[in-house]
Regions:
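Active-site metal-coordination/substrate-binding segment of hydrolases
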Residues: 82-147
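N-terminal helical capping/dimerization or prosegment-like subdomains
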Residues: 2-100
Length: 147
């Protein structure tokens, strides 16, 4: 089995735990355009930094004049030599969920729904951009476990 096959198998095996981590992130109402949610943006950045640290990255929240960002670095395994460099970018902030009456459930209470096209996750930020961001984190988590 190639390293890539092993990583993909690990991603599949860890799907339920990965979804729980994504749902925890989606529950944080990190609305960047509303000053009332500034503390939630900080909480979301701290959450991401802690998650990245849990898989071996040197990660930290960096405060800015606006909302904080998260920077993480991780080197190759000791003794493995120099590895490839990977950079990913995403954002943890979301747009306001208004109008609330358009939501069938709370915008920060993620759920999986069946559609004619298959299952999908419904929550503010699930596709822009917390879902994409967590695909990067989960891929790194799987790679670090098996490669």
């Amino acid at each position: 089995m190639s390293d890539l096959d092993a990583v993909l198998a690990r991603v599949d095996a860890d799907l339920d735990a990965s979804l729980e981590r994504l749902f925890a992130l989606l529950r944080i109402p990190s609305v960047s355009t509303d000053p009332a949610f500034a503390d939630q943006c900080v909480a979301c950045a701290d959450h991401l930094a802690a998650d990245l640290k849990s898989i071996g990255f040197d990660a930290a929240r960096r405060d800015t004049i606006g909302h904080p960002m998260v920077v993480a670095h991780g080197g190759p395994k000791p003794g493995s030599g120099a590895g490839p460099h990977v950079l990913f970018y995403g954002h943890y902030d979301v747009q306001p969920p208004d109008p609330l009456e358009k939501w069938e459930s709370g915008p920060f209470e993620p759920r999986i729904v069946e559609t004619p096209a298959g299952k999908r996750i419904v929550a503010r930020g699930s596709s822009d951009d917390k879902g994409q961001l967590m695909t990067f984190v989960e891929a790194c988590r799987a790679w670090k476990k098996v490669a």
